């Protein structure tokens, strides 16, 4: 790995690329395939640190997962809902909050078995009480530091009971943990969210044969009934729109650019960035639309747009673009007028405090950003100069700073740049390809 990257501003972007497989779907394909009966074949898997942490933990639980090669399909032999083994060692989730939170739900109902989950220094400071609390309502026996809010987390598998759970925030990780626990709970489990969050878990569980339904027009009430078995499937994972977003914004703000991003997942619970790009007046089109395994996909063609408009992000759209806030903060710096991000306090509990980190790092380029408790106010029409900036070990910050460097005058230096490997191992190669 190269932890310092130099980027010269002024290069336009031209060409077509295929971004890595969707991170959210990669995690879920592994987990659901592991508790299905029979074989599940996975193609398009994201070969990066976080999903590989999930694979490693599942192997320790007795799942037969082969050595995963980049860009190669592989097959899992599922254990069924009752086949999870008590591990002989601690389950290390690395830096992956998705791994830890979804496994909490998966393991809470494995009766009579003991599990310990831990992670790296960053993950062990992230809040787990939001998952622990609803699982405890179902009968889960879970403990950890700070009254079960911080890892290491200890789980003693217990008999769970279905119930109705209202979540205070719209979180796909919390919802998914409850639904996975619901597979082993007696009766019916219902999750009601304040806003709809990404629904990859629901789609995949349905494809595997789970008795799951969505109630209400807004998709905020998900109901799962226990009983029955999951059956192994063939899963084709589309490109990750969160990874594509860096090129979508780069092509919009870097002069004389045109980029085609092929086979991107267009799940409507993930496409909030397209709504914001519409508000900005970005020049893009979606081509080759289709549906694979219940997930809509398409290719996104983006050209440079002039006189981009400022925007406001708030309310129910946040869960649909929560991972895109760092790169949209960069975009806001080049819009006419003042943009504002509200209701985004959840970003303070990601790999870093992304609100604070993006304000701090972009200001080094000359951005005018005011940090608020729940968001940011960004003055547009910035003139970026070169700077030495730092990802602060956050993968999405690293890639956002790389795009910001393209529109800065001079050569910028990004420290700890290869944090990007967490979700996009080929990011720097793709950047070189598009700027050559």
From Swiss-Prot:
Listed EC numbers: 2.5.1.19
Catalysed conversion reaction: 3-phosphoshikimate + phosphoenolpyruvate = 5-O-(1-carboxyvinyl)-3-phosphoshikimate + phosphate
Matching InterPro entries: Enolpyruvate_Tfrase_dom, Enolpyruvate_Tfrase_sf, EPSP_synthase, EPSP_synthase_CS, RNA3'P_cycl/enolpyr_Trfase_a/b
One of the protein's GO biological processes: chorismate biosynthetic process
A Gene Ontology term for the protein's cellular component: cytoplasm
Gene Ontology molecular function: 3-phosphoshikimate 1-carboxyvinyltransferase activity
UniProt-listed Pfam families: EPSP_synthase
Coiled-coil portions: none
Binding site for 3-phosphoshikimate: 23-24, 28, 171, 173, 323, 350
PROSITE patterns in the record: EPSP_SYNTHASE_1, EPSP_SYNTHASE_2
Range of residues in the leader sequence: none
UniProt-annotated location(s): Cytoplasm
List of residues binding phosphoenolpyruvate: 23, 97, 126, 173, 354, 396
UniProt entry tagged with the keyword Amino-acid biosynthesis: yes
Keyword annotations from UniProtKB, A to Z: Amino-acid biosynthesis, Aromatic amino acid biosynthesis, Cytoplasm, Transferase
Its job: Catalyzes the transfer of the enolpyruvyl moiety of phosphoenolpyruvate (PEP) to the 5-hydroxyl of shikimate-3-phosphate (S3P) to produce enolpyruvyl shikimate-3-phosphate and inorganic phosphate.
SUBUNIT field: Monomer.
Protein name in the entry: 3-phosphoshikimate 1-carboxyvinyltransferase
